Amino acid sequence: MRLRWQTIVLLLLILGGASASAVYFSMKGNIDVIEDAISVSPASFSIDIAKGAHYVKEVKVKNSGGEAEIYFEDIVEGPDKSAIDVSFHTESGESISSSNKLRLPAGTADSPSETVIHVHIDVDDDAPTGSYAIYIHAKQ
């Protein structure tokens, strides 16, 4: 009888430790947070592509906070994500990347600064036709 009671207590301790570690690991992770003062419009758009085509989409970035340096990341959804290349450029043609960030001037809630960027979309010659969605994320 005593051995059965100890086995039950040991089993409960093991299960409790396993569930506690599962909760700990499921809550751990990396989260990138950007200021809510920066908005990108439009943050996503869809296009019907032609093989080998090059598209340029104008996007406005508004900043209602202090001066900031940002770059952009994209997510492509569609028949063949690898067939679409996306790059970001200033109005003067300068490339925007994590190593060459875009400087946004300061703005206020009543009068946000507005910066125009160009999203260049290159489609491979062998890309399957269809609709592709491109999502844009601004990061600091």
Curated annotation (Swiss-Prot):
<feature type="signal peptide">
    <location>
        <begin position="1"/>
        <end position="22"/>
    </location>
</feature>
<keyword id="KW-0732">Signal</keyword>
<protein>
    <recommendedName>
        <fullName>Uncharacterized protein AF_1119</fullName>
    </recommendedName>
</protein>
